[in-house]
Amino acid sequence: MSNVDHAEIAKFEALAHRWWDRESEFKPLHDINPLRVNWIDERVSLAGKKVLDVGCGGGILSEAMAQRGATVTGIDMGEAPLAVAQLHQLESGVDVEYRQITAEALAEEMPEQFDVVTCLEMLEHVPDPSSVIRACYRMVKPGGQVFFSTINRNPKAYLLAIIGAEYILKMLPRGTHDFKKFIRPSELGAWSRVAGLEVKDIIGLTYNPLTKHYKLSNDVDVNYMIQTLREE
């Protein structure tokens, strides 16, 4: 059975035409993208690397990594977001290869092909996150690195990521996230280690509603990223 939640895909299909509108529902993704790309680039030096972006959506992260000199492939199961990504790269002149395929299917086709794999804000939208993590392990070269980001599962995350972001501040459409699908760092770390990935670093992303700014911090209570390594 395919590791795809069609209801989740439908959510993003409906919003795809606004993906590159920085004042739309995707504003948070645009705002945090420079922080995330810098954090990744500092750890792997993207220039000259072959990179896979799993769950690329409309291509915000994929384009940014390509602009840093990486050769980027972006994959997603949403047809409309991928169409938006392909159109936008015609405007921006950034070269990214986009494909509609699951991580598991691409892992069968392209094992150990990528220096870096990113899988950001995607794991909380699939039925079996551990399956995606195993696929990422298979696709990264020995000695390569895999980056994941998701949302912690605790009362604070429910309050800020769902009640705050979706209902009070209206930064995201209601129903964007399902609290039951949020992932604790301990769970993500355990799944990564079982897959064969060593957790190297973790960082939190926090939002100040007064200044409307995000920053990287040691607070991993809500949004967080991890860096993992496939040993040689």
Swiss-Prot record:
InterPro entries given in the database record: SAM-dependent_MTases_sf, UbiG_MeTrfase
The entry's keywords: Methyltransferase, S-adenosyl-L-methionine, Transferase, Ubiquinone biosynthesis
Catalytic activity reported: a 3-demethylubiquinol + S-adenosyl-L-methionine = a ubiquinol + S-adenosyl-L-homocysteine + H(+); a 3-(all-trans-polyprenyl)benzene-1,2-diol + S-adenosyl-L-methionine = a 2-methoxy-6-(all-trans-polyprenyl)phenol + S-adenosyl-L-homocysteine + H(+)
Gene Ontology molecular function: 2-polyprenyl-6-hydroxyphenol methylase activity; 3-demethylubiquinol 3-O-methyltransferase activity; polyprenyldihydroxybenzoate methyltransferase activity
Domain of life: Bacteria
Assigned EC number: 2.1.1.222, 2.1.1.64
This protein's pathway: Cofactor biosynthesis; ubiquinone biosynthesis
Tagged with keyword NAD: no
GO BP term, pick one: methylation
Top-level enzyme category: transferase
Family per record: Belongs to the methyltransferase superfamily. UbiG/COQ3 family.
Annotated function: O-methyltransferase that catalyzes the 2 O-methylation steps in the ubiquinone biosynthetic pathway.
Protein name: Ubiquinone biosynthesis O-methyltransferase
Originating species: Pseudomonas entomophila (strain L48)
Lineage of the organism: Bacteria, Pseudomonadati, Pseudomonadota, Gammaproteobacteria, Pseudomonadales
Gene from which this protein is expressed: ubiG
